Amino acid sequence: MLSLSSPPWLLLLVLFFFANGSATVVSLAENVTLATLPSTSPISVSFSTTSSVVAPISTELENQTASSSNLNTNNEASDEQTGNSNSNTSSHSRNINGLPSSNSNIDNANSNSSSVSSLSTTTSAISGVDQQESLILATPTALNGSGTPPEHQTIGQAPPTKGEQEAILRALDWLKEKRASDYGWGNDTHVVILAKELSGGRDPNDSVDGHVQVIQELEDTLSVKEMEIEILAMLDRHHTLPKPLDLDKLARYVLALGSLCKDPKHFHGHDLVATLQHHEPAQDIEFALTTLSACSSAAHVRKRQIRRLLDIASGVTDQSVDAIAMVILALRCIVTDHRHRHLQHFVRRPARGLATLQDQRGSFGSLRSTALAMQALQDLEYDPAGHWNRTAASRYILSRQRADGGWSEEPLQDGQEPDIGVGLTADIILALGWKGLGAVRALQCDHVIRESSDPTENGEPKLAVPFGLSSSAEESDAKNISYTYTLWVGSNVTESFSLSLVSPKNTSFFKAMTQAAEMDPRFIFEAREWPNGHYVHTLYGKKEEPRGYHYWLLYRLPELPDPNNTPGNQLIAPVGVDELMVEDGEHYLYWYKKL
């Protein structure tokens, strides 16, 4: 009976063994096939069986591939953020390489795998594409040399990387140690407050004792009060001595107040923004900074201010990194206003010029210049002609952080302490935190929302594109404008005459001169007509004298000319009398002087 029953049992055992072994062999074969693929092989992902949500991703990223070495170099910031350090073993790095492409080995492996394995592979691949899309949007350098980005792609929306966050916290701790007994930071109180507010300080999820938190808030309040005392003291010195205003510092005070959501137009009875706009700086970088401050407070930016910014932007080859960066920040603030969005394309040229100034180390010169350039260029739409490497810039700055958490320019100058660099450290915090000087306007404080809700700009729907750049239907509006026209005679201004004029919009200065001559005989003039326009050689009976170097020079001024404060050469009109269009609220001066 045993002999008769043995064959069925043995047969069953043999069949069972082969069945299990076969399954194991198939499973191992599949695993071996997948495991032997090189880590740099791009994974082919088909979206034909996925939902419509991921279909556009396949279209936008089709045929784009990236090697693991390039992505590890260019996307270091995002890799730090996700905690990835090894592209060959991490699933995140494998998915980075998983851009849509064709690979017969993968296709064969997928076809040999079971339905469950196929579903798992497809899900993983879709997840990888989702991660890749997020990475591209978060990192300016993700598409370096790997194809055309999606249209209207905005770059730089991701938060700071883990390494940047750690550096910021160390820097904030160092700044706290450097706070003086009056709870200020000397000449850098305003920029430290600005950096602390925009960086967000410590993570609110950090466990901080309630008593310690109250003390920190009180200390921060005392620091703000110290800054307010500094502002009032500066204004008092200006009115009583009188002492010229430090416009650069006043502009930074305005930005710091804005970061605290304090309205600088109502500062203890003072309108700091109006004070800024009343004194126009001669230096381009100071002018751009004051304009940025006014714009960040949602104040009206005058047309002539925008024209000057565009003039500076058009000559970026003659400007420093700091000046170009500040002009970009000012223009970007201006075009956020819906009335000026048609000027947005004027940001592109200076941004391209600035991007070309980045060196192989990632820096833009000094640490301060690099920090300012990072603030100006981040979040801009992708521009192949204006490509820059934020990861390299960040890496360069992080490599220069001192052991105590601060930064300083090296080599140190004679007499400088090794722990200097409070202002520089605050500037770098602004750059690493992805919220720089340009973020003040975006805070949407009450006074900013209130000012921005005004649908008009001095009665006009929006600013017309500056003359000579393009034409606009708004320029043809029959609207009168008011301005002044002044004559000065002599280098020491021995004679002075002024007229207040009202003319139709789009009136050339040559027509304005004709109008003035009809009103007052002292403004009668003579001019030669050349192919490129009129050349004025005689005014008020005074003819130019080339031998004696006496000429008539035309100035376009922000305020009524003052003989005790004569204008500089940077305010000379950039075009001739036929091309110069008179504008509302502007002041024009013809000065007969010796060169």
Curated annotation (Swiss-Prot):
Compositionally biased region (Polar residues): 61-83
Chain intervals with Low complexity compositional bias: 84-119
Entry keyword set: Glycoprotein, Secreted, Signal
Subcellular location: Secreted
GO biological process: one example: cobalamin transport
Gene Ontology cellular component terms for the protein in this record: extracellular space
Record flagged with keyword GTP-binding: no
SUPFAM superfamilies to which the protein is assigned, alphabetical: Terpenoid cyclases/Protein prenyltransferases
Cysteine pairs bridged by disulfides in the record: none
One Pfam assignment: Cobalamin_bind
Gene3D superfamilies to which the protein is assigned, alphabetical: 1.50.10.20, 2.170.130.30
Signal peptide extent: 1-23
Keyword rRNA processing among record annotations: no
Gene Ontology molecular functions: cobalamin binding
InterPro entries in UniProt: Cbl-bd_prot, Cobalamin_Transport, Terpenoid_cyclase/PrenylTrfase
Glycosylation sites: 31, 63, 88, 112, 144, 187, 205, 389, 480, 492, 506
Chain segments carrying region Disordered: 61-119, 141-164
Record's protein name: Uncharacterized protein CG3556
Organism placement in taxonomy: Eukaryota, Metazoa, Ecdysozoa, Arthropoda, Hexapoda
